[in-house]
A protein has these predicted regions:
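Hydrophobic/aromatic beta-strand patches that form the interior of the parallel beta-sheet core
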Residues: 2, 26, 174-176, 193, ...
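Hydrophobic packing residues within well-ordered alpha-helices of enzyme cores
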Residues: 12-16, 124, 128, 186, ...
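Asp-based, Mg2+/Mn2+-dependent phosphohydrolase catalytic module
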Residues: 188, 192, 196-220
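Residue-level signal for inorganic ion chemistry
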Residues: 29, 112, 186, 207
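Active-site phosphate-binding/coordination module
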Residues: 1-84
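Conserved acidic, metal-coordinating active-site core of Asp-based
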Residues: 56, 63-176, 180-185, 197
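Short, well-ordered alpha-helix to beta-strand connector turns
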Residues: 22, 109-110, 189, 206
Length: 220
C-alpha cells in the first residue's frame, strides 16, 4: 500500500500512525518517494524557477500566500498567517518561518505552493499560471492550493518509479483520487476510483466512482 499525497512526509505518517511502518510513501505531490526509513527518490526544482514564482506572488498576488517545500521541512514568511497556522496546526507540518523566502535558499527545494483561502486557481489564472505553466507542473489541489512541481514530476511519475522498484505492472495497480493532481494517476492505473464529490474532470479521468469521503468511500 502506498500513501500518495501532496502532503509532507511527517503529516502523512501522523495520518496513518497505526500502520505507518507498513506503508510506502509518495509525498509532496510526487517529488519524494520513501520507505518508512529512507528516501528512494527526490526531484528538485530549479532555483530560478521557484524564486521567480515567489517574486511574482509578492508583486502580483497580494491576496495570496506561498511556501516552499524541501523533503523534510517547509518554509514560509509569516508564522501568524492563516496558511502557516493551517499547515502547522491542522496538517501537522514541520514548517519554519523565515523573514525572506527568496533569501532563505535551501538547496533542495522540491515544490512551490500558492495559497488562497477560497479561490487560488482563479487568482493564479490571469498572470501566474500563464507565466509558469511551461516551466513547472502546475496543479490545483482543492480550492485553496496551486502546487508547482518540477517539470515532468507528478504523483504518477512517482508511482511509476515505485512500480519499477517493486516489479508491479500498471494493470496490477489500483489508485484513488479526488483532485486535479490525481488525474494522471487515475488515467494510467489498471483500476482507479474517483470519489463522487470530486470535480467532473477528476471523475472523468477515473475508471470507477466511489462514495464521497464523508461516507468513507475509499474504505468501502
Amino acid at each position: 500500500v502506498v500513501v500518495c499525497s501532496g502532503r509532507q512526509f511527517v503529516s502523512e505518517k501522523k495520518l496513518f500512525s497505526p500502520i505507518r511502518d507498513e506503508l510506502l510513501y509518495i509525498t509532496d505531490g510526487g517529488t519524494v518517494v520513501r520507505t518508512p526509513n529512507k528516501i528512494l527518490q527526490v526531484s528538485t526544482m530549479p532555483e530560478e524557477v521557484w524564486k521567480g514564482m515567489c517574486q511574482m506572488v509578492h508583486e502580483h498576488l497580494p491576496d495570496c500566500d506561498s511556501y516552499i517545500s524541501t523533503p523534510d521541512m517547509g518554509y514560509a514568511e509569516n508564522e501568524n498567517s492563516q496558511m502557516f497556522r493551517w499547515l502547522r496546526n491542522s496538517y501537522g507540518y514541520d514548517i519554519c518561518a523565515v523573514k525572506d523566502l527568496i533569501a532563505c535558499s535551501p538547496a533542495d527545494v522540491i515544490k512551490f505552493t500558492v495559497y488562497h483561502p477560497s479561490a487560488c486557481e482563479e487568482k493564479c489564472a490571469p498572470v501566474f499560471t500563464p507565466a509558469w505553466k511551461d516551466q513547472a507542473l502546475l496543479a490545483s489541489s482543492g480550492r485553496e492550493w496551486i502546487d508547482c512541481n518540477p517539470l515532468g514530476v507528478s504523483k504518477w511519475t512517482a508511482l511509476s518509479y515505485l512500480q519499477n522498484y517493486l516489479g508491479v505492472l500498471p494493470e496490477e495497480t489500483c489508485t484513488f483520487g479526488d483532485n486535479l493532481n490525481d488525474m494522471e494517476m487515475l488515467e494510467n492505473a489498471g483500476l482507479s476510483f474517483a470519489v463522487s464529490n470530486s470535480r467532473e474532470e477528476v471523475r472523468n479521468a477515473a475508471k470507477e466512482i466511489c462514495p464521497p469521503y464523508w461516507e468513507n468511500g475509499v474504505l468501502q
